[in-house]
UniProtKB/Swiss-Prot annotation:
Renumbered residue ranges of the record's region Disordered: 79-100
Keywords recorded for this protein, A-Z: Cuticle, Repeat
Cellular compartments per GO CC: extracellular matrix
Gene Ontology molecular function, alphabetical: structural constituent of cuticle
Organism: Anopheles gambiae
Pfam families the UniProt entry points to: Chitin_bind_4
Name the UniProt record assigns to this protein: Cuticle protein
């Protein structure tokens, strides 16, 4: 506003100068001009008028009718079930079936009406055994193998000759003392052999032969009598010396 006022005063002065004699020209520095602060313009979003929606009244069917059905049969997972239902006014009729894990089919028939309420009848029936269709045989080339025959082993009868047990007893020589010589004989222990499988082994009874050696005759020779012979008398003859001249 101050800037506008200065300009307006200058214009008035110029207009008056044309009517009044010109005074002495003098020059003065122009006053410093200061810009007035400009107020910031604030922008606000225009308010959006809310649209009011009137609630629509729900449609009411005094005599409803519908009917639906579905079924699932999955051979991979074994899931098999179905359902169907229909309605006429306030009376509902329907049924559903499902295959239980024990292999029986369970079917439920149900009805509902304002007078009798809800009623259901359950039926169980075994499923028919599945018919397995055998795959057509594939022709294969068969090569006949030669028949291999193995002769049954012949059971051999092996006989073992029983060893002849020979017992030899050597009589002890009579010693110088008079104590009697006592001999003790131990009986042969009984031996038993288990027969091997598929082998017939026969043993002949051992032949025990006892050989006794007679007591050696001991003779003592009479001691030799020593004869002492007297020493012969020895005589020495003096040699005869002869000297010849």
């Amino acid at each position: 506003m101050a800037f506008k006022f200065v300009i307006f005063a200058a214009v008035v002065a110029v207009a008056r100068a044309g009517l009044i004699a010109s005074p002495a020209v003098s020059y003065a520095a122009a006053p410093a001009l200061v810009a007035a602060p400009v107020a910031k313009v604030a922008y606000a979003a225009a308010p959006i008028a809310k649209v009011a929606y009137a609630a629509q009244p729900e449609e009411y069917d005094a005599n409803p009718h519908y009917s639906f059905s579905y079924g699932i049969s999955d051979a991979l997972t074994g899931d098999s079930k179905s359902q169907q239902e229909s309605r006429s006014g306030d009376v509902v009729q329907g049924s559903y079936s499902v295959v239980d894990p024990d292999g029986t089919k369970r079917t439920v028939d149900y009805t509902a009406d304002p007078h009798n309420g809800f009623n259901a009848v359950v039926r169980r029936e075994p499923l028919a055994a599945k018919t397995i269709v055998a795959a057509a045989p594939v022709a294969t080339k068969v090569i006949a193998q030669p028949a291999v025959a193995y002769a049954a082993p012949v059971a051999k009868t092996i006989s073992y000759a029983a060893p002849v047990a020979t017992k030899t007893y050597v009589a002890q020589p009579a010693l110088s003392y008079a104590a009697p010589l006592t001999k003790t004989y131990v009986s042969q222990p009984a031996l038993s052999y288990a027969a091997p499988v598929a082998k017939t082994i026969s043993y002949s009874a051992p032949l025990a032969t006892k050989t006794y050696v007679s007591q050696p005759a001991i003779s003592y020779a009479a001691p030799l009598a020593k004869t002492y012979v007297s020493q012969p008398a020895l005589s020495y003859a003096a040699p005869a010396y002869a000297y010849h001249h």
